Each structure stands twice: as C-alpha cells, then as structure tokens.
Amino acid sequence: MAAKDVKFGNEARIKMLRGVNVLADAVKVTLGPKGRNVVLDKSFGAPSITKDGVSVAREIELEDKFENMGAQMVKEVASKANDAAGDGTTTATLLAQSIVNEGLKAVAAGMNPMDLKRGIDKAVISAVEELKNLSVTCSDSKAITQVGTISANADEKVGSLIAEAMEKVGNDGVITVEEGTGLQDELEVVKGMQFDRGYLSPYFINKSETGIVELENPYILMADKKISNIREMLPILESVAKSGKPLLIISEDLEGEALATLVVNSMRGIVKVAAVKAPGFGDCRKAMLQDISILTNGTVISEELAMELEKSTLEDLGQAKRVVISKDTTTIIGGVGEKHAIQARINQIRQEIQDASSDYDKEKLNERLAKLAGGVAVLKVGAATEVEMKEKKARVEDALHATRAAVEEGVVAGGGVALVRVAGKLSNLRGQNEDQNVGIRVALRAMEAPLRQIVSNSGEEPSAVTNNVKDGKGNYGYNAATDEYGDMIDFGILDPTKVTRSALQYAGSVAGLMITTECMVTDLPKEDKSSDLGSAPAGGMGGMGGMM
C-alpha cells in the first residue's frame, strides 16, 4: 500500500480553498450577457472556445493533490446542477465558492463548523421554499423564447427555434440537437412515431425518385417473433389482398422464403407490402411493439401469449393514415389508436421514468414517451467553422435543458435578482445559537454572488448595483446587456426556478461538507527511478559488445 500524505485543520482547509478558488475563478468569468470566453487546449486538433461553465470545470485538474481535491469537489457541484437541470452550472459554482470562502473565515475565527453547516442548511431549505413562492408558470411561447434566449447567451434565434420546436412536438416531445451542414440554424420536425429501422429489402421501394416506401392507409401487422415460413402468413395476406389496402409488417426479423415471397407479391402488385424489423432489443423491443400497437389500435402477435400468426385476422392489425419508410427509419403518421388508451400508456411510461434508476433507462423511456406524445424535432445548428459549431451546439443544448426546466417548475426573475429577493425575505431567519446564525448569514451573503459577478463581468461596480437592486422590490433588477434598471420579467430576463433551486441546493450541500472538513489524505508522489534504471542496461550492453 502506498504511503499517504496527511494534512489537518487550517493547513488542509487553506489548500482546499486554493483549489476551489482556481476552478471557480475560471468558471465565473463566463457568467452573464457580457461574460467572457474561455479557451480550452485539446490534446489534438484546434483549441475549443466555450462560455459553458461545466465545460470549463471539467477541463480543470490541478498539480497539487490537496488543491485538486478542493477543485474536484466544486466540479461535483457544477456536474450535479447540470445533471439535475441542464444549466445553472456557473451559478452553482459561484454560490459554492462564496459559501466556502465565508464559511472557512468563520471556522478560522473559532466558530463551530457543524453549527455553521446547520445554519447554511437551514437557510438553503428556507430559500428553496421562498423560490417556489416567487415562481411563475412558464407555458406561453414568448416566455419559453425568453428563457431559451437567456440560456443561449442572448441568442434570440436559438430561443425562438426552441420555442417553435416545443410548440410543434409538445413539452414532452423529443428535441435533439445536431450539427447542421450550412451557416443557418434549422428546425426539422418529424410528426408521428419514428424509429430507427429501415426497409428489409430495397425491392419494397415504391417512390424511386426519393428511394422511400410510402404506404397510404395501411394495415400494420406486429409480431414479436422471427418469420421465415410464408405458410403461416398466407391467411392474413389473403385477407389484406381482398381489402385492397397495403400492409406493413413489423417483426423481430423476416427472412428466407417469407421475405422472397413478399418481395415477389409486392413487385407483381398482388399485395402492396413492406417489412421492417421491430425497434429495440429484448424487453425494450417488446415494450416498443406494445407502444406501436396502442398507437395503431392493433395487437402484437406474441408466442409468449400462445398466439399464432396463421390464426390472426384483420381485427388484430393496426392501422394508420400513412407510413413512410427510408433506408434507416420508419415513420408511422396518424395512428388510429384510441386517445384514452394512448394517454394511459403515456402515464404508465411517466411512472416508469420516475421509478427508473439508470440514466440509460430514463433516456430510452423519454424517447418512447415523446414518440407517443407528439413527435420528434431536430435542431440543426449552423456555423462557419468547426470550433464555432461545437461552442454553439453546447449553448443550444444548455438552452434546451433550461427551457424544459422552465416548463417543469416555472420561472423567476433572472440576472441574480430572485436570489437577492429571497435573501432579503430571510433576513430575520434565526438558528438555535449564534454559530448557526453566522451560517445563515454566510448563505444569505452568498446569494448575492451571482448578481455581483454579472455586474463585475459587465465592467460596472458590483456593490453600487447590488445596493440599488436591494433597494427595489419584486422583479426590479439590473439588465447588464443594456446597462439599465427595471422589471426583469418585462426585459425578458428569466431563469428557470428548477435551475436556480438546483444550483443553490447542490452548492449548499457540497460547501457544507467542505467547511466541516478537518483532515485531508492523499497518496505521496512516487519517486522517479527511471534515471537509475536507464543507466544499468546501457552499461550491460556495452559489456556484451566487448565480449563480441
């Protein structure tokens, strides 16, 4: 076991504080409409430029192991805030830095660290309740545009694109961000349910100019099994042929004579048919087939339920207004499923999302939810260079997370004003003893830090502006972009309540742990023995050369 380097008390806390300040100072320059860029060196390729707090935080590793521990703990604050709300990482880092700095001063002055932490926790819990009281619901397109614009660093085009996407696919719809091919940002909306499976044979194509399969008002056969024997399909094929409608087959796989016979029938015009593999794998495939069956009002032919393909009838088949199949995707538009059944399925998936433990499961469930609820929108980000593209894509993703958070929990006045108002309302909050009161004051003082930093980044005097804002009421605040005072809601400067709440909670949690740290342990650096080892073989080789 490697020897350890151990530091205690004030010596440990000073080292940790240095690390906290290095990371936070690098991150906080990005805050606000006049925040600066940070250039990140890469091991290969061009450096990347960002104004995203968590991207800066993730790049920072310090040489001194004790300082690095402090930096990594604040990095955890940024990451947790990012995971919870998708934004607010810079605010969270700044709050943590302020609480740690003020808290460690109090510890050095002889205060009890545990009581300080209790005071901080009490202030944070009360502040979260006050934030909920200040929160206003965010449902109209204008408010969503404003939130997206602020989070994308005042890029109005991005804000309006996100609002348009949410309007078209609904608040639960899937919105993905991709790198575009041109200079302009674009929005592409896919209505209906789309999944990543294309046609099994190019001979199914009936639109040769576009290379796709289009089926109008088709029947849809869903089977949770491999189909290789055409005989078991003959009864249903004959029924479909008599109806004169096309047929889409979605199965685990379709191969051998079954596929060959379908291709021949399709080319001869006997039955207009197309076949695709079912989306997903294992249990996920079963669930997605069930989703499709509910959307199209059909039944999944499953051997697990002792159902046989040859006994299936037209009543077992789903229906839709239109199906479009490309080489890679299948889109079902206008499924005839009953609304109450679809809504019940949506509610069931929402419950599964709440119960899911892994991020992967949540992601897949969210995709399924969106496909049932509304559709899929793709935001294609345009830029002149690759460096700009990456920076802009990160901003658009942040803005998207922020708008989702705003729809979920509402919005509060932005520009650091909400936290200043909360701190003002809690000025009479008291703990059980004086040390807890100091902890409360530390947390309330930290709530001014985001506003102070926004003002500082815009080149103004933080104390003067902060006092002016504190003298005002309600949503009165400072617009750093235009250098004027007024109602932040009227200015369109909004922050999602969830983002502000998450930033405060995670900052308070980690900062409280750091204040109560009394000992730090790390590995001693290993001695470099390479120079001694390097000289021995050289001498040996020389001796061998002499022998030869």
Swiss-Prot record:
<dbReference type="InterPro" id="IPR001844">
    <property type="entry name" value="Cpn60/GroEL"/>
</dbReference>
<keyword id="KW-0963">Cytoplasm</keyword>
<dbReference type="GO" id="GO:0005524">
    <property type="term" value="F:ATP binding"/>
</dbReference>
<feature type="binding site">
    <location>
        <begin position="479"/>
        <end position="481"/>
    </location>
    <ligand>
        <name>ATP</name>
    </ligand>
</feature>
<feature type="binding site">
    <location>
        <begin position="87"/>
        <end position="91"/>
    </location>
    <ligand>
        <name>ATP</name>
    </ligand>
</feature>
<keyword id="KW-0413">Isomerase</keyword>
<protein>
    <recommendedName>
        <fullName>Chaperonin GroEL</fullName>
        <ecNumber>5.6.1.7</ecNumber>
    </recommendedName>
</protein>
<dbReference type="GO" id="GO:0051082">
    <property type="term" value="F:unfolded protein binding"/>
</dbReference>
<dbReference type="InterPro" id="IPR027413">
    <property type="entry name" value="GROEL-like_equatorial_sf"/>
</dbReference>
<dbReference type="GO" id="GO:0042026">
    <property type="term" value="P:protein refolding"/>
</dbReference>
<keyword id="KW-0143">Chaperone</keyword>
<dbReference type="InterPro" id="IPR018370">
    <property type="entry name" value="Chaperonin_Cpn60_CS"/>
</dbReference>
<feature type="binding site">
    <location>
        <position position="51"/>
    </location>
    <ligand>
        <name>ATP</name>
    </ligand>
</feature>
<dbReference type="InterPro" id="IPR002423">
    <property type="entry name" value="Cpn60/GroEL/TCP-1"/>
</dbReference>
<keyword id="KW-0547">Nucleotide-binding</keyword>
<dbReference type="GO" id="GO:0005737">
    <property type="term" value="C:cytoplasm"/>
</dbReference>
<dbReference type="InterPro" id="IPR027409">
    <property type="entry name" value="GroEL-like_apical_dom_sf"/>
</dbReference>
<feature type="compositionally biased region" description="Gly residues">
    <location>
        <begin position="537"/>
        <end position="548"/>
    </location>
</feature>
<feature type="region of interest" description="Disordered">
    <location>
        <begin position="526"/>
        <end position="548"/>
    </location>
</feature>
<keyword id="KW-0067">ATP-binding</keyword>
<feature type="binding site">
    <location>
        <begin position="30"/>
        <end position="33"/>
    </location>
    <ligand>
        <name>ATP</name>
    </ligand>
</feature>
<dbReference type="Pfam" id="PF00118">
    <property type="entry name" value="Cpn60_TCP1"/>
</dbReference>
<dbReference type="GO" id="GO:0140662">
    <property type="term" value="F:ATP-dependent protein folding chaperone"/>
</dbReference>
<comment type="similarity">
    <text>Belongs to the chaperonin (HSP60) family.</text>
</comment>
<comment type="subunit">
    <text>Forms a cylinder of 14 subunits composed of two heptameric rings stacked back-to-back. Interacts with the co-chaperonin GroES.</text>
</comment>
<dbReference type="InterPro" id="IPR027410">
    <property type="entry name" value="TCP-1-like_intermed_sf"/>
</dbReference>
<feature type="binding site">
    <location>
        <position position="415"/>
    </location>
    <ligand>
        <name>ATP</name>
    </ligand>
</feature>
<feature type="binding site">
    <location>
        <position position="495"/>
    </location>
    <ligand>
        <name>ATP</name>
    </ligand>
</feature>
<comment type="function">
    <text>Together with its co-chaperonin GroES, plays an essential role in assisting protein folding. The GroEL-GroES system forms a nano-cage that allows encapsulation of the non-native substrate proteins and provides a physical environment optimized to promote and accelerate protein folding.</text>
</comment>
<dbReference type="GO" id="GO:0016853">
    <property type="term" value="F:isomerase activity"/>
</dbReference>
